[in-house]
Amino acid sequence: KEILKSAVEKLNSEDVMPCLATVLVGDDPASATYVKNKHNACKKIGIKTMDHKLSADTTQKELDKIINNLNNDKEVHGILVQLPLPKQLNEFATVCRISPIKDVDGLTPQNVGLLSMGKSILKPCTPSGIMEMFYYYKINLEGKNVVMINRSNLIGKPLYHLLSQNNATVITCHSKTKNLNEHCKNAD
């Protein structure tokens, strides 16, 4: 937190006020809590936030317009569209609409591609936090067998790339994996 707070203060001294815009469609309690926690975390380190709460019956056109406006707003530095979206909305099209330089979740095709090539500018938060824990505790991943039970676009797939880039041998397991117990026994 202190490193982030210091970075925000440096940006402020250069007349840049970092701002995260969140977009929440619908009234899913877990999603609302997640977004609220993001706003609270930003507030603690001095990042301004914008909260866009949309009804569950929002159309793709309405959502696209909001994302376009946020992409074009020079005061907004990051955009987070809370997933999952209601069924009438296209998650892939929505993510693709976010400007890659404002994509804080690292889900746009451009950011996913850069991450897979080890050239990412923005890395997804949770996988980055997991890697920071390895660095903090000085855990060398080189040559280690890592079994990961997650293949989601937000956590599992990015974490796979980050672990591989640190020379770990990564086995990705999921709900259809057979002999999960055996895979886990072989993990370091």
Predicted segments with their positions:
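Positively charged, low-complexity intrinsically disordered leader regions
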Residues: K1-V16
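Short beta-strand segments enriched in small/hydrophobic residues
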Residues: M17-D27
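Short beta-strand elements in bilobed, periplasmic/extracellular small-molecule ligand-binding domains
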Residues: L20, C42-A56, V170-C173
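Short beta-strand segments
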Residues: L24, L80-P84, I149
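Glycine-rich phosphate/diphosphate-binding loop of Rossmann-like nucleotide-binding domains
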Residues: V25-N40, I121-D188
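Non-catalytic terminal and connector segments of soluble metabolic enzymes
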Residues: K44-G46, N69-N71, I98-I101, C184
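Short, well-structured alpha-helical segments in soluble
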Residues: E62-K74
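Glycine/small-residue-rich loop that forms an oxyanion/phosphate-binding "nest" at active or ligand-binding sites
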Residues: N72, Q82-S128
